[in-house]
Amino acid sequence: MCDALKSIKKIKKEIQRTTTVEELKTLRIKYLGKKGYLASKMQKLFSLSLDKKKIYGSIINKFKSDLNIELDLHKKILDMIAVSSLNKKEKNFDVSLISRKNDIGTIHPITYVISSIENFFLKLGFSVITGFEIDDDYHNFDLLNIPKYHPARADHDTFWFDANRLLRTQTSNMQIRTMKNETPPIKIIVPGKVYRNDYDATHTPMFHQVEGLIVDHDVNFFHLKWIIEMFLKFFFNKTVKIRFKSSYFPFTVLSAEVDILGNNKKWLEVLGCGMIHPKVLSNANINPKMYSGCAFGIGVERITMLRYGISDIRVFYENNLKFLTQFK
């Protein structure tokens, strides 16, 4: 059988006659492919005795190894010829010709706004915390005083993986984890993605929140109000008219929504806030008789739309370069 193997010298001449990498690739398939020359020889080994299989198998493997060496060597030669040819062309290239204009990337408006918010609160002594986007209902709901029967836990509002795991609906899941793992005083913001089953001009299934949390002795609503007023004046770069109106959130008691007066003389809601519910503090093993806390939640897309006069939230995620390149 081995007498039927082509001489490696004969195949080497075939290899040397190839002038392109594609021709060499075709030759490699011819001899080493799944249905190639060597594969057919290997098939014939099955009809031989065990002793002959060992002898002829060794010869075929040596032949295959030598052939691979010749193919790889010639490929290196062809690559060198191709590079040399390219260099010759480049010598005749006119460097004074006007090149194609490169597009200059810009920071996404949501990324820019989150960075701006972080910088503001870092100057006030807050720490930035990030964390799980996939969480359990215990941290996303139960510990935040959102009971099993609460409508926010329904399938139409929340993306569930199974009975216990979900895509977080709020960054508050990291607030409760931080309170469980750290001792007061605590002063953090939690920027990140959150998910809710909603999609229209003012809602997307994924959006961004920045939540703030302060826990210490004698924290009161005045501290919360001052921080929010300072932030809104900073963010909108002017003296904006702000109002706090009573609201309800399961995880805060003395809860409020914060509105600003728009250019159209209408009040627009920009964030929610409140004093942390004593039950939430207890759930995090913090004594509500010794400590108090306040929290606020900023919808990043919402305030970005108000800042830049954008009417449809969906444009942030449509990859429209004409829209995105405005934010430089």
UniProtKB/Swiss-Prot annotation:
Reactions catalysed according to its record: tRNA(Phe) + L-phenylalanine + ATP = L-phenylalanyl-tRNA(Phe) + AMP + diphosphate + H(+)
InterPro entries for this protein: aa-tRNA-synth_II (IPR006195), aa-tRNA-synth_II/BPL/LPL (IPR045864), Phe-tRNA-synth_IIc_asu (IPR004529), Phe-tRNA_ligase_II_N (IPR004188), Phe_tRNA_ligase_alpha1_bac (IPR022911), Phenylalanyl-tRNA_Synthase (IPR002319), tRNA-bd_arm (IPR010978)
Cofactor annotation comment: Binds 2 magnesium ions per tetramer.
Assigned protein family: Belongs to the class-II aminoacyl-tRNA synthetase family. Phe-tRNA synthetase alpha subunit type 1 subfamily.
Keyword Protein biosynthesis: yes
A cellular component term, taken from the record's GO annotations: cytoplasm
GO MF terms, alphabetically ordered: ATP binding; magnesium ion binding; phenylalanine-tRNA ligase activity; tRNA binding
Obligatory cofactor(s): Mg(2+)
Protein's cellular compartments: Cytoplasm
Keywords tagged on the record: Aminoacyl-tRNA synthetase, ATP-binding, Cytoplasm, Ligase, Magnesium, Metal-binding, Nucleotide-binding, Protein biosynthesis
Alphabetical list of PANTHER family matching this protein: PHENYLALANINE--TRNA LIGASE, MITOCHONDRIAL, PHENYLALANYL-TRNA SYNTHETASE
Record keyword Protein biosynthesis present: yes
Assembly: Tetramer of two alpha and two beta subunits.
Organism: Buchnera aphidicola subsp. Baizongia pistaciae (strain Bp)
Protein name: Phenylalanine--tRNA ligase alpha subunit
SUPFAM superfamilies: Class II aaRS and biotin synthetases, tRNA-binding arm
HAMAP family with a match to the protein in the record: Phe_tRNA_synth_alpha1
